[in-house]
């Protein structure tokens, strides 16, 4: 059995060397973390669901001309992706007050914002991913002004698409987090969407009941995380109504 070279391991995913130059294999783990690993658990089946949901969303984004790193899903837990140079920022798009925004500004959770708000956080676990401004980003060279414009344009288009997609299946897109990277193609470089989009990185509420269908179920000790993720997948038509919960999937080849 061939051993694959591990490139990077994060909180919820592992990146391995891909089969061809310029590619990587992205493996989705069952680890659930919150508050920068201060809270941690392993929830059987979570990685499989995130892989399927993220595949579905990235495939649709590619089809409408939003560039992503996604190439194809390989199996229940793995995707083949393009290798990019990750920009060290988390880009958060907020449509409804929730989480840290509600707490920071004293806004009642669930309040619809006057317009969508884009926030930037510097990716540094040791610092608890501090919120930063565009001035910080350009001053420290994390991204150029043009790259920031490209990132914001991508974020707005993704928000428009996701809001409509989820609303069509009775889900409100409260907010979501994305990461972007630089894709080098010969002498050209462009900014594309990387990482994942799943209930791990979105706040999703049922339109009618406001029931949480995302990682807040883990953050707030509500339970039922896998069931909520399965419901998101069912509503999107990714898994059938009667499909049983998945187990751990194929054994990871290290």
From Swiss-Prot:
- Gene Ontology CC terms, in alphabetical order: cytosol
Q: What PROSITE patterns does this protein map onto?
A: SAICAR_SYNTHETASE_1 (PS01057)
Q: Which GO terms describe its biological process?
A: 'de novo' IMP biosynthetic process; cobalamin biosynthetic process
Q: Which reaction does it catalyse?
A: 5-amino-1-(5-phospho-D-ribosyl)imidazole-4-carboxylate + L-aspartate + ATP = (2S)-2-[5-amino-1-(5-phospho-beta-D-ribosyl)imidazole-4-carboxamido]succinate + ADP + phosphate + 2 H(+)
Q: Which domain of life is it from?
A: Bacteria
InterPro entries according to UniProt: SAICAR_synt/ADE2_N, SAICAR_synt_PurC, SAICAR_synth, SAICAR_synthetase, SAICAR_synthetase_CS
Gene Ontology terms, MF aspect: ATP binding; phosphoribosylaminoimidazolesuccinocarboxamide synthase activity
> Do you know which Pfam families this protein is assigned to?
SAICAR_synt
Gene3D superfamilies, sorted? ATP-grasp fold, B domain, Phosphorylase Kinase, domain 1
Pathway in which this enzyme or protein is active = Purine metabolism; IMP biosynthesis via de novo pathway; 5-amino-1-(5-phospho-D-ribosyl)imidazole-4-carboxamide from 5-amino-1-(5-phospho-D-ribosyl)imidazole-4-carboxylate: step 1/2
User: Which EC numbers does the record give?
Assistant: 6.3.2.6
UniProtKB keywords = ATP-binding, Ligase, Nucleotide-binding, Purine biosynthesis
Q: Which HAMAP family match?
A: SAICAR_synth
Q: Which family does it belong to?
A: Belongs to the SAICAR synthetase family.
The protein here is known as: Phosphoribosylaminoimidazole-succinocarboxamide synthase
Q: Which organism is it from?
A: Sinorhizobium fredii (strain NBRC 101917 / NGR234)
């Amino acid at each position: 059995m061939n051993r694959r070279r591990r490139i990077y391991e994060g909180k919820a995913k592992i990146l391995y060397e891909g089969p061809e130059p310029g590619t990587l294999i992205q493996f989705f783990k069952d680890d659930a973390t919150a508050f920068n690993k201060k809270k941690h658990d392993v929830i059987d089946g979570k990685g499989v669901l995130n892989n399927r949901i993220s595949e579905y969303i990235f495939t649709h984004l590619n089809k409408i001309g939003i560039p992503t790193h996604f190439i194809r899903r390989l199996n229940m837990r793995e995707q083949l992706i393009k290798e990019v140079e990750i920009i060290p920022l988390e880009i958060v798009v907020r449509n409804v007050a929730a989480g840290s925004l509600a707490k920071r500004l004293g806004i009642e959770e669930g309040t619809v914002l006057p317009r969508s708000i884009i926030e930037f956080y510097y990716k540094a676990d040791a610092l608890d991913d501090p919120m930063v401004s565009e001035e910080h980003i350009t001053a420290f060279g994390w991204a150029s002004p043009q790259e920031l414009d490209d990132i914001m344009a991508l974020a707005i288009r993704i928000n428009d698409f996701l809001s409509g997609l989820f609303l069509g299946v009775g889900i409100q897109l409260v907010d979501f987090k994305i990461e972007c990277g630089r894709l080098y193609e010969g002498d050209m470089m462009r900014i594309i969407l990387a990482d994942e989009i799943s209930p791990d990185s979105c706040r999703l509420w049922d339109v009618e009941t406001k029931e949480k269908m995302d990682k807040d179920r883990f953050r707030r000790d509500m339970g039922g995380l896998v069931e909520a993720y399965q419901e998101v997948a069912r509503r999107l038509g990714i898994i059938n109504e009667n499909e049983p919960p998945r187990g751990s999937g194929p054994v990871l080849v290290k």
